[in-house]
Amino acid sequence: MLVSVIIPTLERPQLLLRAIGSVLRQTHRELDIIVVVDRPDPETASAVQSVGDARVRLVLNPHPSTAAAARNAGADHASGEWLAFLDDDDEWLPNKLERQLAFASVRRPALVSCLSRIVTPTATYTWPQVIYDNSSPIDEYLFDRRALFRGTGMIQSSSFLLPRWLFDKVRFNVESAHDDWEFVLRLSKQAGARIETVPEILVILYVEEQRPTYTTRTWSWSRSLKWLESIRPILTRRAFSGICLGVVGSRAAQEGCYRAFPALLYRAFRYGSPRRWHVLHFLTYWLTPRAFRRQLRGLLRIQGPNPA
């Protein structure tokens, strides 16, 4: 069973080689690896060539813009009946694809995810804390905050494995400010796909706050708000509040845009149904220093995943 692995990259050949190496070490050997670049990049081309494996191909994205466009371009060149995605600064554990394919064989149609080991400059932990079980809307799982300093749900593109035909129903929105989230939301709520999670750590995500990244571009709070309004028809009121006060609100606070404070509170209550945690988190972002929030997150972090 051929799996096409799509890796968008941008002038980071050493990180890319780590990512490619983790794919080539997979116990599932039927692989098609597509590295996508936005523009001619001799160093990346040289790195790919140095791998010396015919399964690794370099593709130039004909419509360069975002990681979403690069992922779509990679899918257009894919030969596999299954697609998987990997950011160039992340890596997989060797049995990632084997375990997900086995899981998918009895849970179709589905996007199959897994647990991740998150590595930051100051800590290492497992995420998500709560495994999605399809008993609640996917948007509430991702955004309906049930704790003050950190949500408990996550589905990230480096963990994705799904059938090619299912990907073609949705594809990534190249105009989206949050394309990973939107892809999962539309896959579940519009295409009717299940989201399944292998309850094992199979991906390592490296989060380095000062490192520029191609696949996790940071948008302004106003761009995130426009995105939220564009997907409001498919969101529950609870999820709308969570995104408005959590995602958009935290970005506005980081930007110091004080006029956003009343506007976002109004929208959250007008179009959503906020929990107390949504409001407390929103206020905390505006009223407490970032270093203090980090310390508390570390103290309150729950160890180990649980069912949703």
Question: How would you name each of these model-derived features?
Answer:
Residues S136-S220:
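Conserved nucleotide-sugar donor-binding catalytic segment
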Residues I201-E209, T213-I243, R259-Y271:
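Catalytic core of nucleotide-sugar-dependent glycosyltransferases
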Residues Q26, D41-E43, A253-A308:
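Membrane-interface aromatic/basic loop that binds lipid-linked glycans or pyrophosphate carriers
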Residues L83:
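Short aromatic/hydrophobic "clamp" motif used to bind/position activated sugar donors
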Residues D53, A69, L97-L166, R217:
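Flexible acidic/His/Gly-enriched loops in nucleotide-sugar-dependent glycosyltransferase catalytic domains
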Residues D41-S50, E91, N95:
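Acidic helix N-cap motif at the loop->helix transition within catalytic regions
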Residues G21-E30:
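Short, acidic, metal-binding catalytic loop of nucleotide-sugar glycosyltransferases
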